[in-house]
Regions:
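Acidic, low-complexity intrinsically disordered tails
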Residues: 113, 148-166
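P-loop NTPase catalytic core
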Residues: 1-147
Length: 166
């Protein structure tokens, strides 16, 4: 009832664990939703779904990018690509040789999920108000979100508030 689609292309890119998020599935999601809502956070599955939607949209947009290039995408679609890259590199990628990133608690995963999703949602709103995509994707908070996975458990709450306020 669970399938983890191992992906040699991800392994070749040194993305570990090399599990393809689009080909993998679990038939236990309904049961897991109850558990995550009760034990981690009420919005866990909602955040997960937002990330999965972005990853699926990225896969569709990659086909366009391969044919006509990234410049053919609208700023909103380019932002989706950047958000999906953040999900892949900052949330899904794990460095098993790093002292802190070897293991990530569910609390920390939830915080990371919230940061990535919040950045995307706030950026979409800013784009709608006329903000520059280039400025949005080069904001220092992007790097802080990327480094959040290296924050030690005892400093999570303080660092989360700091990054979220950026």
């Amino acid at each position: 009832k669970v399938f983890w689609g191992l992906d040699s292309a991800l392994a070749y890119k040194r993305h570990f664990p090399a599990i393809n998020w689009l080909n993998s599935y679990s038939l236990y999601l309904d049961d897991m939703e109850k558990w995550f809502n009760g034990n981690v956070a009420e919005d866990w599955m909602e955040g997960r779904q937002k990330m999965m939607t972005l990853l699926q949209e990225e896969a569709e947009l990659e086909e366009i990018v391969k044919m006509v290039g990234m410049d053919a995408l609208s700023p909103t679609d380019r932002l989706k690509m950047e958000a999906a890259r953040s999900i892949r590199e900052d949330f899904l990628h794990q460095n098993s040789f790093h002292e802190v990133d070897t293991y990530t608690s569910l609390k920390k995963q939830h915080m990371m999920m919230r940061l990535v999703n919040a950045f995307y949602e706030r950026s979409v709103a800013a784009l709608g108000e006329g903000a520059s995509l280039r400025k949005l994707i080069s904001m220092p908070v992007r790097e802080q979100i990327g480094r959040f996975k290296y924050v030690k458990e005892e400093a999570l709450n303080e660092e989360f508030v700091k990054v979220d306020e950026e």
